[in-house]
Amino acid sequence: KTKITDYANAINENTVMLMKVHQSNFSIEGFSEDVAYENLKLLADQNNLLDYYDLGSGYIPKLPYNLGNREHSLSEILECSPSLISFSGDKLFGSVQAGIIAGRADLIAKLKKNQLLRMLRVDKITLSLLEESIKAYLKEEYEQIPTLWLLFRSVEELSQRALMFQEKIGADYCEIIQSETYMGGGTLPNRRFPTIALHIKGKATTLEKKFRKAHVIGRIENEQFLLDFRTILPSVEEKLITIIETIIGKK
């Protein structure tokens, strides 16, 4: 349990900043407590200190399936005028792998002068790709962000794609099941939401090895090998069908 009084009691003449780190890839269930960023920000302001939120992953649009109920969006946090906030360019933001720091202009200017930036700065290609992602956000063209597009797909859409697979492969070899999935990648730990999966019939462990050799990652659930349709892009569907047919012996 971490309370705001723990922060307050730790402040002394050497304190410069109060920091909060998001639980990106784990969660503590049961009798636990942490400090809301708003309360940390207020305490920092009251003591003339900087505040820094290491968000890990950040999102902008309202998330489906109530996934954002316990997570602040980037917009909500920035409205609090944080001294500094950092988050990943990939993960929920859905762009290239990069670290993004936002906050007070004077603090950002100081960070730019740090010699470590010469080693950590990204190249022009990364910046240009990140720029295109940000443009998509500004235009609210979320379908241009593959991570968000997959996340926002309805169960009905996924069911239609799975049915197409089953019709081509054959019901004797696979079945469509309702399942639950996770965002993964250090985001929204233990937050499950609905998906549709294709159960490839056969021994699960053997199938997993064969698909992995073909560079296809599925998962084993209830001793069944599953392909999660919330992870399948339209551009790879035909190739994936060919791989499935090859592995199960239809080709």
Model feature map: region roles:
Residues 1-135:
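Conserved PLP-enzyme active-site core in the AAT-like
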Residues 46, 170-172, 205, 246-251:
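Short, glycine- and charge-enriched coil/turn segments that flank and shape catalytic ligand pockets
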Residues 56-57, 106-112, 138-147, 189-192, ...:
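Short acidic (Asp/Glu) and glycine-rich catalytic loops that position anionic groups and cofactors
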Residues 114-115, 222, 240-243:
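Composition- and surface-driven signal marking solvent-exposed, interaction-prone regions
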Residues 119, 212-219, 246-251:
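A common structural junction motif
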Residues 124-127, 131-184:
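Conserved PLP-dependent catalytic core of the aminotransferase class-I/II
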Residues 159-235:
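Conserved C-terminal alpha-helix-loop-beta "cap" of PLP-dependent enzymes
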Residues 232-244:
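Short, low-order "capping/linker" segments at domain edges
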